[in-house]
Amino acid sequence: YIVKDIEKLADTIREAFQIAQSGRKGPVLVDITKDVTAAKTYFESMEPAVIHPVCETIKEKSVKEAIEMIEAAKQPYVLLGGGCTLSDASEQVREFVKKIDAPVCDTLMGKGVFPGEDPAYTGMLGMHGTKTSNIGVSQSDLLIAIGTRFSDRVYGNAKTFASRAKIIQIDIDPAEVNKNILIDTAIIGDVKAVLTILNRRLSQQQHEAWMQEIQDMKAKYPMTYHQERLSGPGLIEKI
C-alpha cells in the first residue's frame, strides 16, 4: 500500500491489519508519504476489523496419502516451523509425535512448540542446528514438515537435503509447497486442523530401533561449550 491522501490513511491501516492477521499471518507494507504524516484530519473510531477465518479445504486424498506414507515409514522425522506457533497447535503436535513415535527437530520460529526436555526432541535443524538433527534428517526415510517454509538456512543444499526421505509438507499457504524443496505430498490447511484429523485417523506406530539410534546419536553429539571460559550457556546454567 502507498498512502498519498490523509483521508485514506485510517481505512488503509485498518485493511492492512486485517490482511496481516488473516490466513497465513505476516507483515503488510504500508508506505506513507511525508506530507501525509504531517497532515491533520478528523478521525472517527471504528469497530475492530473482522479477521477472516481460514477456509478449510483439507483434501481427503492428501490426508490418505500422508497416512499411508507415515504408516509405511521406518525412520520418520518431524520438522516444526512457525506455522505451528501461529496455529496454537502445541497440544496437537505433541499428540502427533507420540502417535507416530518419531524424533522431532524445529526451526527458530518453531521453537517452543514441542518441549525441549522431551527425549524425542533433537534441537534445531540446519545451519544453526544440532548435529543430531542434521544427521538424523539425512538418514530418515520420511520427513514430515509442519508449518515451515523451508528457508535456505534450514535445508542448505536443496539437492542433497533429506535425500533418502520422502517429504510430507503441511502448510496453510499453497504457495509454500514445492517452492524451495520438492516434496512428495502436501496437505493444505491450518496446522491444528490438519493434525487433529491425522491424530484421529492414524494408528499407533512403533519405531523402537530408530528412536534408540537417535538417542545414541544425541549422546554421541551432545550440546557442549567451553567451560574453561565465560560463555552464555555457562552463565545461564549458573543462574
Predicted ranges, named:
Residues 1, 51-57, 117-129, 180-193:
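Short beta-strand elements at the ligand-binding edges of bilobed clamshell
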Residues 1-46, 69, 134-168, 236-237:
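Structural signature of the thiamine diphosphate
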Residues 7, 164-239:
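Phosphate/pyrophosphate-binding active-site segments
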Residues 7-8, 31-119, 211-239:
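Cofactor-pocket helix-loop regions in the catalytic cores of large enzyme subunits
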Residues 13-14, 90-91, 180:
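Conserved strand-to-helix beginnings and helix N-cap segments that scaffold or border functional pockets
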Residues 37, 110-115, 151-152, 174-178, ...:
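Short gly/pro/ser/thr-enriched loop/turn and capping motifs at secondary-structure boundaries
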Residues 84-168:
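Glycine-rich, anion-gripping cofactor-binding loops and their flanking helix/strand elements
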